[in-house]
A protein has these predicted regions:
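N-terminal export signals
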Residues: 1-2, 7-27
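Active-site gating/metal-coordination segments in enzymes
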Residues: 224-374, 436
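Distinct, well-ordered alpha-helical segments
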Residues: 246, 280-297, 318-321, 373-389, ...
Length: 563
């Protein structure tokens, strides 16, 4: 739909109460409108990215994440963690600051949207926060070096981290060009440079991250991202001893509601559910109920699903059977050391699953044995734990069990495929995504053959063909850690599936690429007209004055559902 000048002028902010206090609903900003050819094509095939992130450093415990999680893989990052402890994260926009900026942007554009006007604002905000982040990192490094000189640079990691920070260019355009010249790899100095690039993302406005993603992934790709599903994260209890982030989860939800409106429905979100925090709330140790937050987000704020993160320290089911003392870890708060903690985790997860089944709400779970603070917790991503969840639950197995899928490494993916059932059986609504499959960046030919073999093997009498359940996902902005090559993730997958489309033996019941990039996600998210999920979104758009998004028009044109 092409928006008129009247719709542009009527896009001024309308007042609405949120937990941020006095915040507003943001009408779609039409200078970067839903039919902008840079990010949109009404004639391109439906493309949905089911797995993305646009958070910033006020939304997650970035220092704890780098120190407790990423440094387990790359020990040199412990030195980066020390610097991040010195950073004043008030530089990263809070939820209230982001809403204020969105109001300013809308005010600037309410009298009319001249050519490139939104782009000028977007670029100015991006450069402002890039410079602020660069300054914050350099100042923090100076303090650490002064305190530990010359010890800090005497180690390989300290020297690599210091060089990466001191080398940051003086403007964002120079920085982006500098990134494109580098080819990061997940080893040594390159891993440090990539981690610093990820940290620089954490100083940005969330709306800047959104439009950077949309423009980067649309460049050089025949497909355009019609719908991006972003996932909020809640690591307050698993990583931060119960201390909330600078922008609390409730405020993050409010901000992402506004961004859904800002983008004209091109971006929707999953609310985070941490069962550890829910147990803490039930016991009186936390004032915030994840259950209440996710239900409000789904029913009235345009959110479309719920995100859980097992490698932070819980299985999807069966926690009561863990060995005694399993949660007695030094980084976990004392209330989690109690002997009945596993049973309580199972209880709150069972309540969540029942509500999701009753309301037609999908779940996404991180299923790769990675991104946890210890190996014991990462092992909780094993597929066997999912046999005990309710059979009617709708689930996306994020990363399809492993981010390293290769022809000789298919066992975890096949184990997750075996969980998927046909209509009427357990797992009838189980899916998986291809987010952060690093071989797509490093060895796309190798990944093509791995996926071909996987599709050929994953066809059975009791399980549906994998071709009908695997979905496209990127895991941007986490993928930024892989370096500048991450910008080619979508285009590389386009080429991979262009090759696979020629093989009629893979079980797609139609064009495999159409399934992978759009149809399977539309089925998983229940986006077709008449579903409870679609009804919630249609009501959300009507209440906020958002025209029918392009993704909805494309979904409406899909042939009847083929399971």
């Amino acid at each position: 739909m092409v928006l008129t000048r009247r719709q542009i002028i009527n896009g001024a902010l309308s007042i609405g109460a949120t937990s941020l206090g006095g915040c507003v609903f943001v009408r779609p900003i039409t200078a970067f409108c839903p039919d902008d050819p840079r990010i949109s094509n009404p004639n391109s095939p439906l493309t949905i990215d089911v797995h993305g992130h646009v958070f910033n450093g006020s939304d997650i415990q970035i220092e704890r994440y780098i120190t407790l999680v990423r440094a387990r893989q790359t020990p040199a990052l412990k030195d980066l963690g020390e610097i991040l402890q010195e950073v004043g994260w008030e530089v990263a926009p809070s939820g209230a600051q982001e809403i204020s900026v969105l109001r300013q942007v809308n005010q600037r554009l309410s009298a009319g949207c001249g050519p490139g006007e939104f782009e000028r604002l977007h670029i100015a905000h991006r450069n402002e926060k890039y410079l602020a982040g660069r300054s914050a990192l350099n100042e923090a490094l100076t303090r650490v070096e002064s305190r530990r000189r010359p010890a800090f640079r005497s180690t390989y990691g300290g020297n690599a981290v210091a060089n990466a920070i001191r080398s940051l260019p003086t403007s964002y355009p120079e920085y982006h060009h500098w990134q494109l010249r580098r080819a990061y790899r997940a080893v040594g100095t390159d891993a440090v440079n990539a981690a610093v690039a990820f940290v620089m993302r954490q100083f940005q406005y969330r709306y800047v991250n959104v439009f950077d993603f949309l423009t980067e992934y649309s460049s050089g790709s025949a497909r355009k991202i019609d719908l991006l599903i972003c996932h909020c994260l809640d690591f307050d209890w698993p990583l931060a001893l119960g201390k909330p982030t600078m922008t609390p989860i409730a405020d993050q939800i409010d901000v992402m509601e506004q961004i859904s409106i800002l983008t004209g429905g091109r971006v929707h979100c999953y609310a985070p559910f941490d069962p550890m925090k829910q147990v803490a709330y039930d016991l009186g140790y936390s004032t915030e109920s994840p259950e209440s937050l996710v239900q409000k987000a789904i029913l009235s704020q345009g959110f479309v699903g719920i995100k859980i993160y097992p490698p932070m320290g819980f299985a999807p089911a069966g926690n009561a059977h863990m060995k005694p003392g399993f949660w007695n870890r030094k980084w976990l708060p004392a209330p989690m050391h109690r002997p009945d903690f596993g049973r309580r985790l199972d209880d709150v997860l069972a309540r969540l699953y029942s509500w999701c089944v009753a309301n037609g709400v999908p779940i996404m779970a991180h299923t790769s044995p990675s991104e946890g603070p210890c190996s014991d917790f990462e092992n909780l991503t094993a597929s066997d734990y999912w046999w005990a969840v309710p059979g009617g639950l709708t689930v996306n197995f994020g990363h399809f069990g492993d981010t390293e899928i290769a022809p000789d490494n298919l066992s975890r993916a096949l184990a997750y495929w075996k969980l998927m059932g046909r209509s009427g059986s357990h797992g009838a609504n189980f899916y998986a995504d291809a987010a952060y499959l690093t071989e797509a960046l490093k060895e796309p030919v190798k990944l093509t053959e791995a996926l071909r073999r996987l599709f050929q093997m994953a066809q059975g009498k009791t399980s549906p063909a994998l071709a009908q359940r695997l979905m496209y996902g990127s895991d941007w902005e986490m993928l930024v850690i892989e370096g500048s090559a991450s910008e080619s993730y979508l285009s590389n997958f386009e080429q991979i599936f262009s090759n696979l489309d020629r093989d009629a033996s893979l079980g797609a019941q139609g064009k495999l690429s159409a399934r992978f990039f759009g149809i399977n996600a539309a089925n998983y998210l229940s986006l077709r007209a008449g579903s409870a999920a679609r009804a919630r979104l249609d009501a959300f758009y009507a209440a906020r004055g958002v025209p029918t998004p392009q993704w909805a028009q494309k979904v409406n044109a899909l042939p009847p559902l083929v399971a």
